[in-house]
């Protein structure tokens, strides 16, 4: 889980660096605002994942039915959000005005989401196996 978060942060760092000068047209301004919003959501997501990991650690020490249900529900919500983001990324990747750097960022974000979803599903299965 820590590796995924570190990878996600590294991807975020790559996304923020661009060698091109800023153009001042509406599409680039929209892209800039979109990237700012994505960065905010990634930070919130990272904090949520840290909190979820703390909950799982606490659950392993003292398992309760309520905690198990809450953790599984949170994981299902995160997985659903990743699925929703995947659709947005697919639509953005179809744009013809993307440069190679933007395409790379979108592909990395999509791959990161796929990895995160896979790991969350594994963790969810592990949590479900713990007897209460």
Swiss-Prot record:
Region of interest: Immunodominant conformational IgE-binding epitope: 25-53, 102-132
InterPro entries noted in UniProt: Mite_allergen_group-5/21, Mite_allergen_group-5/21_sf
Keywords associated with the record: Allergen
Example GO BP: protein complex oligomerization
GO MF: protein homodimerization activity
Industrial and biotechnological uses noted in the record: Non-allergenic peptides identified from the mapped major conformational IgE epitope-containing areas could be used for the engineering of house dust mite allergy vaccine.
Subunit structure of this chain's protein: Monomer. Trimer of homodimers. Oligomerizes in a concentration-dependent manner.
Family label: Belongs to the mite group 5 allergen family.
Protein name per the record: Mite allergen Der p 5
Organism name: Dermatophagoides pteronyssinus
